[in-house]
């Protein structure tokens, strides 16, 4: 088995919104990488022993006092270095070049760079040719400052009309700087540039692939837990499902999954989870029907934050009770993933590389005295999904739209009642079913229904009815930080509305939410 961590790239984060994207791109190329804050020590870099280092972007100005710098050792480690945006500027300044503050002539958005010299980073890459025969590349810029003089030993590799050094290189030392962002899709050949850097310049082998990651995870799990028993809170979500499958492969019946049905799940979800993991895959599952317990605890509570806390607290109580019944369990498995582990490196203290302990089970009791097993803690969400496919989990389950931890508890506005949850479940199922039928489900990033605790007059036949209102919500987004409401066809919305009102006794009106984020959030609560 090839060692998936044998070749690796270290990415130093200076606070750019794109930094995690760089890491995901390097991994897509097939190379393992880690993301650390910019102020790491020489000892930490030596211990990690990367085959190459990427200095990422950031919002600061190299010209400002106390702005972040790469550790000096980066340039003495004898490995290739790629500086992106701020990373290029700090590389230039630290090695003797000059950076000037942008005054009203920064570049933001699409730009075309003209190639001035050959470079291993840009080998055989070209988007267009200028009238005088120069290679041109379509890239994405986002910078105010710019390099005004490059360090000794470097050559200018590319320019734009306003940026004389859009790319620079010192081929002898294998140092490269690009003022644009190769990691975003708007830079058309960005993946090829990153591939040149990781595979050709750094000499990494593409060992990081789903089948190898699974083999490695199973080996490590066997080594970590030995013959001990493990307990896992299985929610039916992507992360816990993939953890369950990995552990099942590694230790079989020594895994006990606890599935808590809180009464706040989607239509038939509990049944589907039990059928898939229990009947189909043969996992050992304890099914706890706790609907009444959760609804009793939520009685009379309308505040969203308080509802979240109640749902979290009751879950922990139930999980703790079930864990105590598993008297031989020595380990608790969790679906922690890499973004949970990374603290954004743009922190004011500069101490962001201190890994945060992340409990996505929501603060389990300290007296559980179980060791922690986190087989996904190196993986991004898209990698977890690919591994899930490889492990045999169904595509439509792995690529389902996000569902909040508290479930319908935050999609029923105000107080949560069984009647409201039952109506909402059915309305939401109709909306999702129609999205699939119209081939729209995968064209939106997230779609769901919200129950509004308001009654509205409606007409059915000759009679009037006075029933509840639901709102449909569908958004398009890349990163869920900002989102646009989805412009679904009117006839489609009409069809969904008609079905909900005609098929569900208790709902008299359907509205469509046309708020973007910002100013609204994606979820209503």
UniProtKB/Swiss-Prot annotation:
It comes from the Bacteria. Keywords: ATP-binding, Glutamine amidotransferase, GMP biosynthesis, Ligase, Nucleotide-binding, Purine biosynthesis. Residues 208-400 form the GMPS ATP-PPase domain. One of its GO terms (cellular component) is cytosol. Pfam families: GATase, GMP_synt_C, NAD_synthase. It catalyses: XMP + L-glutamine + ATP + H2O = GMP + L-glutamate + AMP + diphosphate + 2 H(+). Residues 8-207 form the Glutamine amidotransferase type-1 domain. ATP binds at residues 235-241. The active site is at residues 85, 181, 183. One of its GO terms (molecular function) is ATP binding. Its EC number is 6.3.5.2. Pathway: Purine metabolism; GMP biosynthesis; GMP from XMP (L-Gln route): step 1/1. InterPro entries: Class_I_gatase-like, GATASE, GMP_synth_C, GMP_synth_GATase, GMP_synthase, GMPS_ATP_PPase_dom, NAD/GMP_synthase, Rossmann-like_a/b/a_fold. Homodimer. HAMAP family: GMP_synthase. Catalyzes the synthesis of GMP from XMP. This is GMP synthase [glutamine-hydrolyzing]. It comes from Shewanella sp. (strain MR-4).
């Amino acid at each position: 088995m090839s060692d998936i961590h044998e070749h690796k790239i270290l990415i130093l984060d200076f606070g750019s919104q794109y930094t995690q994207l760089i890491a995901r791109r390097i991994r897509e190329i097939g190379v393992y990488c880690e993301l650390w804050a910019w102020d790491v020590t020489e000892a930490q870099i030596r211990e990690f022993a990367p085959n190459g280092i990427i200095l990422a972007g950031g919002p600061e100005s190299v010209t400002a006092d106390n702005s972040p710098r790469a550790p000096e050792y980066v340039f003495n480690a004898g490995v290739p270095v790629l500086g992106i945006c701020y990373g290029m500027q700090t590389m230039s300044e630290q090695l003797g070049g000059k950076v000037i503050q942008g005054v009203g002539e920064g570049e933001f958005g699409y730009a075309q760079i003209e190639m001035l010299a050959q470079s291993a980073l840009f080998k055989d890459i070209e988007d267009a040719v200028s009238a005088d025969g120069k290679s041109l590349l379509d890239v994405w810029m986002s910078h105010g400052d710019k390099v005004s003089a490059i360090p000794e030993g470097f050559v200018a590799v590319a320019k734009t009309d306003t940026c004389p050094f859009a790319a620079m290189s010192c081929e002898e030392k294998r140092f490269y700087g690009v003022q644009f962002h190769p990691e975003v899709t708007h830079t058309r050949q960005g993946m090829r540039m990153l591939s040149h850097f990781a595979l050709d310049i750094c000499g990494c082998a593409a060992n990081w692939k789903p089948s190898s990651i699974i083999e490695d995870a199973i080996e490590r799990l066997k080594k970590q837990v030995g013959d001990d028993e493990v307990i896992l809170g299985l929610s039916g979500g992507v992360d816990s499902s993939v953890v369950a499958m990995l552990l099942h492969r590694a230790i079989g019946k020594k895994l006990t999954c606890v599935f808590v049905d809180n009464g706040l799940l989607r239509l038939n979800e509990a049944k589907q989870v039990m059928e898939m993991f229990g009947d189909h895959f043969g996992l050992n599952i304890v099914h706890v029907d706790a609907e009444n317990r959760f609804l009793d605890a939520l009685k009379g509570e309308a505040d969203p934050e308080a509802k979240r806390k109640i749902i979290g607290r009751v879950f922990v109580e139930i999980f703790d009770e079930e864990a105590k019944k598993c008297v031989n369990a020595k380990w608790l498995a969790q679906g922690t993933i890499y973004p949970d582990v990374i603290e954004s490196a743009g922190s004011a203290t500069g101490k962001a590389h201190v890994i945060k302990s992340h409990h996505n089970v929501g603060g389990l009791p300290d007296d559980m005295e179980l060791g922690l097993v986190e087989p996904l803690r190196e993986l991004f969400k898209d990698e977890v999904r690919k591994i899930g496919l490889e492990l045999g989990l169904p595509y439509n389950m792995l690529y389902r739209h996000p569902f909040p931890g508290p479930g319908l508890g935050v999609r029923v506005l105000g107080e949560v009642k069984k009647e409201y949850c039952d109506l909402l479940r059915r309305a939401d199922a109709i909306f999702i079913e129609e999205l699939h039928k119209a081939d729209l489900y995968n064209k939106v990033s997230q779609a769901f229904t919200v129950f509004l605790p308001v009654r509205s007059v409606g007409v059915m036949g000759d009679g009037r009815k006075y029933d509840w209102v639901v709102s449909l919500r569908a958004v398009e987004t890349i990163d869920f930080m900002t989102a646009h409401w989805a412009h679904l066809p009117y006839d489609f919305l009409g069809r969904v509305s008609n079905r909900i009102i005609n098929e569900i006794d208790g709902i008299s009106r359907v509205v469509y939410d046309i708020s973007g984020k910002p100013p609204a959030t994606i979820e209503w609560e």
